[in-house]
Swiss-Prot record:
It catalyses: (S)-2,3,4,5-tetrahydrodipicolinate + NAD(+) + H2O = (2S,4S)-4-hydroxy-2,3,4,5-tetrahydrodipicolinate + NADH + H(+); (S)-2,3,4,5-tetrahydrodipicolinate + NADP(+) + H2O = (2S,4S)-4-hydroxy-2,3,4,5-tetrahydrodipicolinate + NADPH + H(+). Its EC number is 1.17.1.8. The gene is dapB. This is 4-hydroxy-tetrahydrodipicolinate reductase. It comes from the Bacteria. Keywords: Amino-acid biosynthesis, Cytoplasm, Diaminopimelate biosynthesis, Lysine biosynthesis, NAD, NADP, Oxidoreductase.
Amino acid sequence: MTERVRVAITGGSGRMGRTLIEAAKQNGIILLGAAIERAGSTLMGVDAGELAGVGSMNVAITDSLDKAVNDFDVLIDFTSPEASVFHTDWCAKNGKAIVIGTTGFNHAQKEQISAYADQIPIVMAPNMAVGVNLMWKLLEVTAEVMGHYCDIEIIEGHHRYKKDAPSGTALKMGEVIAETLGRDLEKCAVYGREGMTGERDRETIGFATVRAGDIVGEHTALFADIGERLEITHKASSRMTFANGAMRAATWLVEQDAGLYDMQQVLGLKA
């Protein structure tokens, strides 16, 4: 690829938004074309680079995708489920690709976004860290070999401000394991335990959630049998790992046809 990829970033003033701006600044292929913030923000007109602490980038924070329509090729969206659906609708109407890192979607919202994939290329992934996507491949192999003979638990931890639980990454871990074992996660998932729960059902997949301090993201899948257990863990120490993954997704996405993709495809881990 010889031409730079122009991106717009929504939620530009948030923790993840600022990290995405910093990642764009550091990336030799990416060019920041626009940074979007909600209407009424006191940061309108502030230089996005200055806001992110990386120096001037000559891109002012704006509240309008319409005004920036000619300034970018790919929208990178880590906001909220409602906002992401709105932004995907806008991209479909304006012929823009979109990378979605938002989590917490309900089934109907996922279906809405999937429908737009007939018109535009979309990467939608609950976690864009390379290590996490490799972990999902490891979970497939582990579930095939051990899953039918083990108790399976998924434990995740995030900072105190995270809104959804379990995390999208944890749910994806459960989906990967359940699909490999031929189970329906909606029927076999157990979200927390309390009181006299009785003996554990081996067919279930348990989830436990921690929300504390400034934990960036920690996920563990535990496969426990009598006499041994295997733990597969990923720990993120910086949001930059997610931001760099989003930049990688954007550079890949501009060369794709309309469709719904995930980070496994971006990284070449599946067709």
